[in-house]
Amino acid sequence: VQPAHLRNVSFNISHHGDWVLLVGDTSLESTVRVGVDVMDFQDQPAGESFDTFSSGFLEQFSAREMAFMKRAAADPAAPVATRNQLRRFYRMWCLKESVVKALGVGLDFNLKSFEFTVPDVEQTIQPTLTTVMQVHEPSADFPEEGWSFEEALLDPDHCYAIAVQTEMEGAGPVMDGSEITKLDWQELLQDAVPYPVQ
């Protein structure tokens, strides 16, 4: 890559519903891997119980992760219970997908080879930075150390997760919850210039 100072640029993009997210890192001191995912809560299966829906994902989530999703409501028969359980499903899916994207592997990657411990509360627009990941068989390609996560709501209908892995020893968390800058399409294009056609 030329120029040389751009060799360590790492970025990732995700889109769903009304949002497009771009995360990046331009640190020159180390190799940083980033991944992001966003999900639209409105994209929900109609008329299906959460147990029926989630049974198709038993190979992707651990028993502990599934239990977290199912604990979303006190009365599992209430319609709001299924909605809240699906919101937790999308939250966990965003976390899994953000790691897969940071690693640069496809969704055929074994999603059960790692699992998350997340705060047992519902997401808000206030970022959660205390999510922890356990890698069951760490390797040079998939270390357990150096991961940081940020997850929150972008609005009432969309959640996101960002995964960052750095190889800097003792770096600690690299996000503090202030990383998200929201731009509408007009702000994004205000300084745009047409690409010269040849």
Positions of predicted regions on the chain:
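Core catalytic alpha/beta fold that binds nucleotide/phospho-ligands
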Residues: 1-198
